[in-house]
Amino acid sequence: HVVAAITALKERGGSSMKKQSVFIKKALKSGVEKGTLVQVKGKGASGSFKLGKKPAAGRTDA
């Protein structure tokens, strides 16, 4: 997703990692909180991440 977002910017001079790192860290943090990403190793944005399990589709107890 991050690569697609940076590619979509189509900046001729490239993108600044310093400026984009804030948004990347925020996206990783929210992904871990929602469960779409799982942090496998490390702390913060320097760790390793993988995709989380998809939640069960619309199951309710009645």
UniProtKB/Swiss-Prot annotation:
Histones H1 are necessary for the condensation of nucleosome chains into higher-order structures. This is Histone H1.2, embryonic. Residues 1-53 form the H15 domain. Keywords: Chromosome, DNA-binding, Nucleus. It is found in: Nucleus; Chromosome. GO terms for cellular component: nucleosome; nucleus. GO terms for molecular function: DNA binding. The keyword Nucleus applies. SMART domains: H15 (SM00526). Belongs to the histone H1/H5 family. One of its GO terms (biological process) is nucleosome assembly. It comes from Parechinus angulosus. The keyword Nucleus applies.
